[in-house]
């Protein structure tokens, strides 16, 4: 099995969202999620009438204590300026696999020496990731999805049991 190593800049287009504040969210309420640098609610800060992105993307939080948090997005959405966005351009790369691989690597590249932790685009695009063949990436992503779902269910059940005991 051949493993290929790519830097993000060699397989993705990197960008950021736009300036979206709470006033804009209030005045433009709709059905499309807006993602920010927050991590609660999967990074969703609200919903608006329009969208800027449509398809499979990987996003990351660029600032604050959760800088480097990685998310897989699939569908129509917008993003705030504190949300980095990767669009996979290489057909040999599964976006969901990329998201899982980046979750493992991104935190290593966060600048924690500044007053506000930050993960700049210039750092993200230099991150090297090892990729097995596409079929293997898809299998790994499916396995990790299943594990993530089971883990969330188990956590919810344990929380419910602990709450019931108290």
Kindly give the residue locations of the regions a language model identified.
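Non-catalytic DNA-recognition/assembly elements of restriction-modification systems
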Residues: 1-18, 28-38
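Short, recurring structural edge motifs at helix starts
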Residues: 20-23, 113-116, 126-131
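Short, structured segments at the rim of ligand-binding sites
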Residues: 25-28, 51-53
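A short beta-sheet element
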Residues: 37-42, 46-103, 115, 120
């Amino acid at each position: 099995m051949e493993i290929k190593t790519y830097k993000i800049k060699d397989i993705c287009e990197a960008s950021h969202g736009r300036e979206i504040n709470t006033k804009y969210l209030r005045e433009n309420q709709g059905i499309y999620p807006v993602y920010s640098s927050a991590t609660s609610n999967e990074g969703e800060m609200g919903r608006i009438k329009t969208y800027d992105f449509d398809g499979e993307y990987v996003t990351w939080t660029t600032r604050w204590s959760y800088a480097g948090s990685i998310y897989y997005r699939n569908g129509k959405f917008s993003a705030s300026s504190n949300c980095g966005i990767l669009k996979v351009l290489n057909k040999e790369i599964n976006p969901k696999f990329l998201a899982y691989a980046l979750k493992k690597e991104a935190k290593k590249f966060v600048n924690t020496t500044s007053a506000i932790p930050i993960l700049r685009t210039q750092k993200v695009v230099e991150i090297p990731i090892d990729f097995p063949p596409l079929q293997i990436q898809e299998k790994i992503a499916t396995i990790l999805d299943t594990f993530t779902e089971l883990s969330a269910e188990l956590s919810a059940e344990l929380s419910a049991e602990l709450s019931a005991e108290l």
